[in-house]
């Protein structure tokens, strides 16, 4: 078994399998994040505090949660591919499109984790922080917010990597030859092309397309581009 960061390499497991602490909700009395754990601390015969493996239990102890890791699926999708086509409408108008998709797998959204567990005053919070625990009795999936609080890197920030992206749409119009008159032009086509039009996934602002190891953080997403052009044949 080889553990590397958030993932594990193990015989019989898919590559890029996530190996992380597992959350167990939020304590409605204290607002603390709860975790499943199978490590605890005990005093040995020499009076020394040691970590001991035990039956699974639920705790808000971050140290014990960080030691107790679980398998959470892989970055690998179940299915991925693209769909595209091009065709002509009314003789002179052409239209083409290209889409890509991926179904299954997970990514760890480091930016989401950072905006839900802010370490410094003045940093931005994610909009999901509005669901946070605020008073005893609140039942929510978002723990109390603490600047500089202690949290385990857990499955809370594992997001489905499934997506559907509209990569390109191109619309063109070829002028009838009679419109070209006496110009020494065989054909003239005017077109507009739109790149990276839309992305539909499970987290606004996250782009799972180009990271194959499973970590999404400070990386550039493809820019949306609109271009116009002419195709001339003489």
Language-model segments: which ranges?
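Outer-membrane beta-barrel translocator domains and adjoining extracellular loop/strand segments
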Residues: 1-2, 108-114, 203-208
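Conserved small-residue
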Residues: 1-75
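C-terminal beta-signal and terminal closure region of outer-membrane beta-barrel proteins
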Residues: 4-32, 129-130, 135-137, 151, ...
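Residues that define the transmembrane beta-barrel architecture of outer-membrane proteins
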Residues: 77-81, 162-167, 222-226
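Transmembrane beta-strands of outer-membrane beta-barrel proteins
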Residues: 83, 95-97, 188-192, 228
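Transmembrane beta-barrel domains of outer membrane proteins
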Residues: 84-88, 172-176, 231-233
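Repeated loop/turn-to-beta-strand initiation elements of outer-membrane beta-barrel proteins
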Residues: 92-95, 178-179
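Extracytoplasmic gating/loop element in the C-terminal half of outer-membrane beta-barrel translocons
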Residues: 102-190, 194
